[in-house]
């Protein structure tokens, strides 16, 4: 039995133990941390699966107990989430059968999507049914995530051989080894920490979500200012140590969006605190940047902080010439003698253009998950959603999440509002609804009712 499976078994036993002891807060806290940080399940012969499948199975068992004990509490938003996501899933199934290239292996795609939906639904149900103080629960979850990621991140940064061995053993499996292979072959050390993930990009998304959550606490809980400030700086520090472009750009975009909302809502008394958060952000950049220079990462600081994190440059790699037809024959016929322009256009094409072209050919319901013409599927939740489910599926998601955002804005639920917007921002550069680390935070967002701390 591998160390991965031993860790997973012990964690699952802890979740079940505290659940049986009716210490639901600890059970849900461990569950939330596990969705983010738990290693992959190693089966043998190089085969591994995401441990979120096992965690979701445990959630289903706990849900059944809730149902049979008649303690389950469900509100409208949770039902709407479950219904909307499953309707979208049905659309993708139809799209695959009608327009796609169906294979037996595609069942895995749909099982993964459904377990994600069930996991988000289950965690939200636990928060409501046991009347947990969700803000206290999530602060504890964030502390656990930060501690584990700094521990592993520091090993990666300062002990390459051990860090690589731990990362490959715990978090790398088939199809997910490209980032660490690139580091191994081209650099020979970790210049970007991976934390408890297979890629620093995922750590960057997690960093941005955590600091967005803590921002609200900084502005509304003066009694715990020092504690919240430490959590904010620590959360941002993880994204910077990962040289995450999403974190570097996103932290300022989120700050601007929050500032605009505060002005629109005339929350003038909070604005000084919001500028205080900006000062903490700049301080963290200076602190982490200085430390990175001191350990010989100066060239990477210059590149990621000032060049690669240019918003226009960051978007071009994915979205350049997205809406233009990628059949260059037409351009050549209409512009005889302009071969150079044709070649240059090909060079600056984003990696999602072919994916978007498939959507344009099947705009109503898409083609389902998987490739039909060797197009790249990934790196954007929005384009992937259009590819997989077409305009219908995109509309379902837009109506649900858009309605939720508007509702939170009107009801001044800023923590949920900006956490949803941060998840949406992450969707610009990755498929956020396929990563288990998003599950606990999305569950927080669909818990609309005010909850009280359980006894």
PLM features: what roles do these ranges have?
Residues 38-47, 303, 315-392:
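Long extracytoplasmic/lumenal interhelical loops at the membrane interface
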Residues 151, 157-161, 262-333, 357-358:
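A membrane-periplasm/extracellular boundary helix in multi-pass inner-membrane enzymes
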Residues 210, 254-256, 417-455:
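Transmembrane alpha-helices of multi-pass inner-membrane enzymes
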Residues 218-228, 252-264, 388-424:
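Hydrophobic transmembrane alpha-helices and their immediate junctions
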Residues 273-274, 281, 407-413, 443-455:
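A juxtamembrane structural motif centered on a specific transmembrane helix
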């Amino acid at each position: 039995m591998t160390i991965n499976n031993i860790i997973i078994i012990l964690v699952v036993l802890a979740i079940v133990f505290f659940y049986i002891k009716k210490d639901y807060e600890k059970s849900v806290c461990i569950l939330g941390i596990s969705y983010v940080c738990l290693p992959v399940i190693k089966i043998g012969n190089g085969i591994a699966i995401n441990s979120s499948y096992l965690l979701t199975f445990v959630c289903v068992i706990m849900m059944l107990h809730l149902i049979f004990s008649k303690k389950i509490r469900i509100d409208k938003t949770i039902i709407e989430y479950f219904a909307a996501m499953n309707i979208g899933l049905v659309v993708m199934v139809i799209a695959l059968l009608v327009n796609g290239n169906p294979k037996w292996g595609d069942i895995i795609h749909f099982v993964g999507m459904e377990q994600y939906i069930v996991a988000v639904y289950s965690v939200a149900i636990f928060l409501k049914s046991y009347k947990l103080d969700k803000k206290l629960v999530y602060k504890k979850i964030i502390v656990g995530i930060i501690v584990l990621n700094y521990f592993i991140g520091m090993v990666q940064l300062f002990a390459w051989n051990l860090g690589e061995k731990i990362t490959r053993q715990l978090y790398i499996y088939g199809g997910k080894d490209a980032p660490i292979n690139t580091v191994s072959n081209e650099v020979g050390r970790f210049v970007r920490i991976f934390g408890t993930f297979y890629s620093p990009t995922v750590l960057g998304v997690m960093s941005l979500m955590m600091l967005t959550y803590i921002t609200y606490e900084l502005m509304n809980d003066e009694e715990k200012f020092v504690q919240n400030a430490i959590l904010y700086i620590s959360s941002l520090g993880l994204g910077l140590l990962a040289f995450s472009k999403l974190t570097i750009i996103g932290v300022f975009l989120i700050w601007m969006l929050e500032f605009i909302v505060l002005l629109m809502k005339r929350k003038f008394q909070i604005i000084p605190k919001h500028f205080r958060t900006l000062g903490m952000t700049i301080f963290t950049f200076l602190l982490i940047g200085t430390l990175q220079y001191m350990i010989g990462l100066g060239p990477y600081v210059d590149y990621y902080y000032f060049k690669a994190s240019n918003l226009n440059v960051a978007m071009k790699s994915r979205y350049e010439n997205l809406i233009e037809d990628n059949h260059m024959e037409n351009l050549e016929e209409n512009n005889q003698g302009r071969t150079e322009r044709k070649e240059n256009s090909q060079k600056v094409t984003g990696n999602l253009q072919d994916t978007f072209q498939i959507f344009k050919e099947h705009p109503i319901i898409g083609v389902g998950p998987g490739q039909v013409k060797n197009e790249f599927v990934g790196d954007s939740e929005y384009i992937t959603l259009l590819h997989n489910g077409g305009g219908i599926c995109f509309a379902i998601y837009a109506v649900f999440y858009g309605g939720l955002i508007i509702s939170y804005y009107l009801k001044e639920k800023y923590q949920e509002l900006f956490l949803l917007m941060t998840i949406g921002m992450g969707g610009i550069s990755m498929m956020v609804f396929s990563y288990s680390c998003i599950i606990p935070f999305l569950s927080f967002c669909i818990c609309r009712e005010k909850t009280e701390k359980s006894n």
